[in-house]
């Protein structure tokens, strides 16, 4: 059966939420973030402003730029509304961030109805949130991801097959390939790889030897539309977790605590959404040196008590002896149970 994979991506998610809350901000250059830009409105992007840029640098490009503090709690609330809507359609969905995800439509939508479904999906999100999203549909996750970025904002693009995909991307800059960031792109330029089609002259063996197994295989396969990754939806749930990688590493304890609170809230809402209980917790950190550490704790009972889980997980986080800037933070609820009988309420004597 032909695979039908859809990728949705909310348009300038944080900035669009702030414009919704204050319509006077519409059509004005706006960024969300006090020190670092997390999201730039489309008006701000016209000045060359982008995420991960220092707000002070952004204001040099646009002196009239408006900077608004991050309100992760509100963004997560709206993200959960979107997730709940999608889960009413199918559980074959992989939420990869608050503002994007993959949906496996194979067997749900007929091939001839792909565009009609995408249009209805976008409109339903707009009705629910007054926000727009862009949708890409392809024959695998790679093609769907690239497709969703083509007609932003509020756009749709569909790749019917590998031939269609290769014809489109061949003349595009190599950075269109997921995993080819700014630094890797510069390395490729030194080797005279500027466009996607420049990769075709090299063998898989050469690319792996030159750039390493992971990067080499990704280049070779991606330019050919080859990607067999499954949409990793939750079947039988054993753990619920999330990780966040920071393009600007966390440097202070206050930054770490802020991001921990946000990540905990998002992950806890997934626990509640699935109506399950956790009896173990894990915290993971990765430094800029790429040293990675995890700490776990087995709880005496399975619970979904928010305050209890938060305090236990915060205690785990505080037990790390921080030795460097942090580029990744992850938290996980494990040993998942569905029965309420194993939970002891904290309002009773234990």
Roles of regions detected by a PLM:
Residues 7, 189-328, 335-343, 347-349:
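DNA-contacting surface of Y-family translesion DNA polymerases
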Residues 137, 331-333:
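Hydrophobic/anchoring residues in structured secondary elements
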Residues 1-216, 339-343, 347-350:
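Gly/Gly-Pro- and Ser/Thr-rich, intrinsically disordered tail segments characteristic of DNA damage-repair
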């Amino acid at each position: 059966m032909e695979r039908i994979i859809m990728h949705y991506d909310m348009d300038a998610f944080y900035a669009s939420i702030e414009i919704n809350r204050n319509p006077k901000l519409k059509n004005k250059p706006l960024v969300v973030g006090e020190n670092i830009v997390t999201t730039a409105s489309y008006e701000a992007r016209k000045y060359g402003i982008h995420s991960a840029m220092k707000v002070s640098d952004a204001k040099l490009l646009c002196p009239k730029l408006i900077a608004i503090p991050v309100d992760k709690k509100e963004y997560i609330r709206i993200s959960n509304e979107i997730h709940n809507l999608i889960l009413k359609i199918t559980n074959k969905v992989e939420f990869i961030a608050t503002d994007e995800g993959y949906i496996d439509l194979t067997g749900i939508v007929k091939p001839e109805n792909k565009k009609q479904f995408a249009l209805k999906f976008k409109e339903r999100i707009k009705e629910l949130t007054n926000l727009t999203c862009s949708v890409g549909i392809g024959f695998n996750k790679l093609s769907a991801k690239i497709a969703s970025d083509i007609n932003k904002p509020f756009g749709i693009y569909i790749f019917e097959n590998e031939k269609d995909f290769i014809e489109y991307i061949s003349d595009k800059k190599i950075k269109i390939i997921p995993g080819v960031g700014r630094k890797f792109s510069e390395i490729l330029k030194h080797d005279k790889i500027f466009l996607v089609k420049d990769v075709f002259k090299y063998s898989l063996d050469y690319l792996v030897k030159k750039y390493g197994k992971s990067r080499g295989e990704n280049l070779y396969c991606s330019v050919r539309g080859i990607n067999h990754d499954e949409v990793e939806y939750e079947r039988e749930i054993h753990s619920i977790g999330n990780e966040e990688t920071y393009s600007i590493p966390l440097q202070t304890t206050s930054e770490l605590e802020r991001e921990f609170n946000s990540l905990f809230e998002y992950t806890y809402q997934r626990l509640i959404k699935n109506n399950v209980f956790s009896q173990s917790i894990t915290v993971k950190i990765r430094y800029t040196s790429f040293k990675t550490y995890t700490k776990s704790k087995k709880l005496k009972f399975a619970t979904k008590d928010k305050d209890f889980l938060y305090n236990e997980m915060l205690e785990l986080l505080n037990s790390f002896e921080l030795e460097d800037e942090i580029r990744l933070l992850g938290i996980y609820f494990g040993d998942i149970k569905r029965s309420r009988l194993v939970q002891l309420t904290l309002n009773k004597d234990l």
